[in-house]
UniProtKB/Swiss-Prot annotation:
Enzyme class: transferase
Repeat listed as a keyword: yes
Stated role: Involved in the biosynthesis of lipid A, a phosphorylated glycolipid that anchors the lipopolysaccharide to the outer membrane of the cell.
Catalyzed chemical reaction(s): a (3R)-hydroxyacyl-[ACP] + UDP-N-acetyl-alpha-D-glucosamine = a UDP-3-O-[(3R)-3-hydroxyacyl]-N-acetyl-alpha-D-glucosamine + holo-[ACP]
UniProt cross-references to InterPro entries, sorted A to Z: Acetyltransf_C, Acetyltransf_C_sf, Hexapep, Hexapep_transf_CS, Lipid_A_LpxA, Trimer_LpxA-like_sf
Protein name: Acyl-[acyl-carrier-protein]--UDP-N-acetylglucosamine O-acyltransferase
Assembly information from the UniProt record: Homotrimer.
Gene behind this protein: lpxA
EC numbers on record: 2.3.1.129
UniProt cross-references to Pfam families, sorted A to Z: Acetyltransf_11 (PF13720), Hexapep (PF00132)
Length: 262
């Protein structure tokens, strides 16, 4: 059974799933689609062609699906936001719709935890089980892999890719790509180590040891990172190690390393 407060505004055409809870003064636009058991809390706004998956919550005064903060945006149609199931979008977050410079959609996977005042710009692609701490700021076209964590007060430059199970520490500033399973920190942030806390939560001891060996081979040799990745990908059978190597070989923004490395 839907529970919609009498002061909430639901435009004609909006699709609201079963057991939705829409609180006072919330707004849901005509093109929005809310899954089952979705909660839109007091004063939150769901705009444009936004789709929110089952069992998700949008907290007070968050704004999901408004137009992008992009000076080249021209009132494009068929753009929007897609959010997976079990997402938590906390107070005052802003998530902008996509543009035709991407595929038109800003995407967020399942089990996202987006803390208060965070910003996700147009055309970002966010994996599943991602955490953004308070005031994390993603510029346009940023990509975060599954299980990535971005600390509070950290901005990420447009088009940057952060790999699977990465950690970007709080109060950092990131302008280059972070290899899967690694931890980056600083202003400007560079890769400091493996994200051991994160990978130990996901993988068994043998898998962690494979990643430790790969990290030492790639980053502690004082040799070209891409040369090391080419050599390692040719001889490893470990899928996680292959992900690291492939990411390095595909980067367009470069990998942030300590000074003196290339």
């Amino acid at each position: 059974m839907k529970n919609i407060h009498q002061t909430a505004v639901i435009e004609d055409g909006a699709i609201i799933g079963d057991d939705a809870n829409i609180e006072a003064y919330a707004f849901v636009s005509k093109d929005a689609v809310l899954g089952n058991n979705v909660t839109i809390k007091q004063g939150a706004r769901v705009l444009g062609k936004t789709r929110i998956g089952d069992n998700s919550r949008v907290f007070s005064y968050a704004i999901v699906g408004d137009i992008p903060q992009d000076i080249s945006y021209k009132d494009e149609v068929d753009t929007g936001v897609i959010i997976g199931e079990h997402a938590t979008i906390r107070e005052f977050c802003t998530i902008n719709s996509g543009t035709h410079k991407g595929d038109g959609i800003t995407r967020i996977g399942d089990n996202a935890f987006i803390m208060a005042y965070s910003h996700i710009a147009h055309d970002c692609i966010i994996g599943s089980n991602v955490i953004l701490a308070n005031n994390a700021t993603l510029a346009g076209h940023v990509e975060l892999g599954d299980y990535a964590v971005v600390g509070g007060l950290t901005p990420i430059h447009q088009f940057v890719r952060v790999g699977e199970s990465c950690m970007v520490a709080g109060a950092s500033a990131l302008s280059q790509d972070v290899v899967p399973f690694c931890l980056a920190e600083g202003n400007r942030a560079y890769i400091r180590s493996l994200n051991l806390v994160g990978i130990r939560r996901r993988f068994d001891k043998e898998q962690v040891e494979e990643l430790v060996r790969a990290y030492k081979f790639l980053f502690n040799q004082g040799i070209s990172l891409k040369d090391q990745a080419n050599e390692l990908i040719a001889k490893t059978s470990d899928e996680n190690v292959k992900k690291m190597c492939k990411f390095i070989l595909e980067t367009t923004r470069g990998i942030p390393l300590a000074k003196g490395r290339d």
